[in-house]
Amino acid sequence: YKRQDKDGIVDDYIIYMLNALRQNASEIVAVVNGTLENKSKDKLLSITNNVIERENKGFDVWAYKTAIDQYGWEKLVKFDEMIMMNFTIMGPVYPLNEMFECMDAKDLDFWGVTKFHKYENGDPFGTIKVGYIPEHIQSHFIAVRNSMIKSKQFQNYWNKMGEINDYRDAVGKHEAMFTKRFSEMGFKWDVYADMGEEYNNHPILCATREMIEKKRCPFFKRRSFMQSYDNIISDTFGQSALEAYNYIDQNTDYDVDMIWQNILRLENQADIKKNMQLNYILSSKSSNIDAGIIKARKIALVMHCYFEDLTEYCLHYASMMPESADIYITVPCEKNKEIVEQAFKQLNNNVQVIVIQNRGRDVSALLVATKTVSYTHLRAHET
């Protein structure tokens, strides 16, 4: 199981996944590209005593090779099956024994959970020797059976694995070609959750709910919730992540808080907002809120008024606040302070104008100049 994290943290979804795997695997090796914080390393050690921390190079490919080299072929050929799996999938949303029992009944040499359909319109990575993306098992989960583990072809593949310098190398030298290479050698393969030609090239991303609901796919991609929106909108209406999230939340036992724990720590909030359709339109009509409730609230409005000619605009905005709200305006010089103070005299609010250095734009106005404004229940920020 390969994992990497820029902060060296192992989130709860990883532990949940490994605990589920432990019920179906006799041994687990956790390979970390990078270093772990002590608390996170202890988490992994609670699952397996074989935790490898290595330099963050070679992507998944060399993480797997590192584990293979540690075991050696003499030991590996004694296993019925070897799984190569990474952290880019979350789950499981169903018991994994369902999948393993289903695939155990099939006469195969290697198998996976999902596949990427053939893409004939060229090689977008520029590293795939056949010039297109062949149909292949997606590399987030590939299981190799003993018949293939003990083969010279498979052993030579890993013994002679070249350097992987970037993501394009990883795709061209391993991910996109692994299935085609060994299939042409006569090894039989299949996937557990196959939508066939019903959907596009990447069903686990673009038809996630259908994969879970109709094909009982136990996993989903963490990238679903924060990928480039341009990628997903070319194949869908943008609904895939939210539909999948709602289905998982409402129809499975999977704790969706584990999704948020990871993506909020690591990913761009703008990407999360787009993929999860977190768009809200406030009503133009005022609600009948008890004036006493508003008065009891401690509200601060922080405004950065850099240009003198924005004074009237800021005043208009601030005048919409309840009189109980405190108003803090940051300005770049004493001259602007005098102008703003004069303009804001007409308000009954507690108004404070603060001169700040011309550094950090509006962010410093919020995080530095008004950092002591910590007593509020609600806080607004306007530039």
Task: For every predicted segment, state its role.
Residues 2-382:
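ER/Golgi luminal nucleotide-sugar-dependent glycosyltransferases, focusing on the catalytic module
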